[in-house]
Amino acid sequence: MVSSPDYNPNILNRSEFDIPLAESSLDEAPFFNRAISGSYPPASTIKPFIGLLGLEEKIIDASTIIEDVGFFQLKEDGRRYRGWKEDGHGKVNLEKAIVESSDVFFYELSSKLTIDRISSFLAKFGFGETTGIELLTETESILPTRNWKLGNIGETWFVGDTINIGIGQGYITSTPLQLAVSLSAIANRGIIYKPTLVTQDYGQESNQKTFASVKIKNQSHWEVIEKSMISVINSWNGTAHNLYKEGGTVIA
């Protein structure tokens, strides 16, 4: 668990060291543990969850094609939501949408899913909650709902809000640790392990506690999403292909 920027731990050994004073005087707040206290938009890392929900709700299947022309236009008001790639990604199925991070694919999908289903599904993976790690400064992230927006912003929910959530922007936030724990559930086929601090490696004797277990209707959907995530690195057109190493460990 890493937080950057770091600091020299030796300065904490000095009896006269004043941590609050140092925090206020040092640039970029190195004593702020971003891994558990920083709350940020999850951005495109939310897309595998939205894709999985789309499969589960039968809004799409693995072969569904959406034409990504660089923007998605709302029928209600004609407003255009642009993707990061100006000229679009062309014909896109779910795997390509995750591999190339097509915003337009997930704009359209999330608009059909609605915020109610999205929020309920993400909550199962721990979004909007702390992980329960044994550290006092862990921040609870935001999983917005219609009632959350009405109570905190004083406005009703709009379809445009849902579209933003579909690409991990807007009101939704997560801590780096919470996001890592949630994403690990895809590799673990729905099992979410509670992160914990350890003093040594207990090997096979370790009795790691589960935080929750996400049940889905079709188990093959785990493989569809995991394969797409792996291809983000292993495929030449993946947005993280620069991390690929020949013969190295496959990661997603």
Which residue stretches match the model-derived regions?
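Beta-lactam-recognizing serine transpeptidase/beta-lactamase-like catalytic domain environment
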Residues: 1-44, 49-252
